[in-house]
Amino acid sequence: MLEADNIRADKKRETANTHHINARKKDSASPTAFDKEVFTPDSAHQSNSNKENPACHFNVPKNVTLQRNEKGLALVKDGMELRADFLSLLPRTDHNKIHRELLVRAAKIKGEQNPIAIDATAGFGEDSFLLAAAGFTVYLFERDPIIAALLQDALDRATQTPELAAIANHMTLIEANSITELAALSSGSSSVLTETMRNDFPDKETLRPDVIYLDPMFPERTKSAAVKKKFQLIHILENPCENEEELLSTALNVRPRKVVIKRPVKGPFLANAKPSYSLKGKAVRYDCFVFA
C-alpha cells in the first residue's frame, strides 16, 4: 500500500517543503532566547544555499553548535552529538512486527484503510515513523526551529534511503505551534495544516484527522548515561510541556476519532483528564480518548 502511494506522497512532500518554510517565518523562535548565531559545518559541506545551510534561519544556544557531516545535521555540545535518524527503527517496521507495536495498537482505527494522524509534539519523529510504517499519513508539528531542522534533515535523508523512503514519504513536517494550528483546524480557519491537508486530500469534504497523538516530554528515568545526556541536550532547546491543559483541550476540540497520549507507565493522566482506556507497556502507557 505504501509503494502504491509514492506518486501522491512525492507531490505531498514538495508542497510540505514550501509550507515548512512558511511556518518557520511565522513561528520562528524569539532571538532573545539565544546568545548568538552559530553554524559550524564541515568545510566540504559549506554552502550559501539556505536549503544546504538551515541554521542560517535561527540562532543556537551558547556553547552549542550545529554541524553537518556525511551522517547528516547534528547538534553538538561537549563532544555529545544529537542527530535525528530513522534507520535504527527499521527492524521494528517489519510487517509481522509493526502492528504489534503498542503505539500502533493504541492508534489503530478499526476499518480505516488510509488513516490520518497528527503528531502534535513530534520531537525527533520516531513515533510518527512507526505510525507511518503502519499505514498512517502523518503530519508532524515541531515548534522549536533547531529540532525541526534536525528532524527535516532526517526526513530528507530517509527519502533518499531505499528501505526508508516509502515510509518517510508519508510524513510531513510543519514547523509551527501545534496548538495554534489545531485551533485553526477545529474552527475551519485557514492555516498551514489546513492548506496542506486540502492539497493532500482534495476529495475530502471534512478535514478531520483520525488520530491526534500527544507526547509531552517527561523526565527520563533510564539508567543509560547516553540517553540521559541526549535528553539533557534536547532540554537545552525545549522544555517539557508547560501548558498541558491547553494542548489536550485543543486536541479534543478537533474531535478526531481518537486522541492518544504517551505517558510514563505510572505517571498521572495528562491534565488530570481520565481517558476512555489505556494500554500499558513496561515503561510507557498510552491513554486513549475515543470519539464516535
Where are these regions (language model features)?
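Conserved Class I SAM-dependent methyltransferase catalytic core
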Residues: 244-290
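S-adenosyl-L-methionine
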Residues: 1-12, 20, 24-25, 33-42, 144, 148-204, ...
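Short, glycine/acidic-enriched loop or turn micro-motifs at the edges of active sites
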Residues: 122-124, 145, 180, 218-219, ...
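SAM cofactor-binding core of SAM-dependent methyltransferases
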Residues: 100-107, 115-118, 122-160, 176
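Conserved proline-anchored active-site loop of SAM-dependent methyltransferases
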Residues: 117-130, 209-228
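Mobile active-site "lid"/loop adjacent to the S-adenosyl-L-methionine
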Residues: 216-247
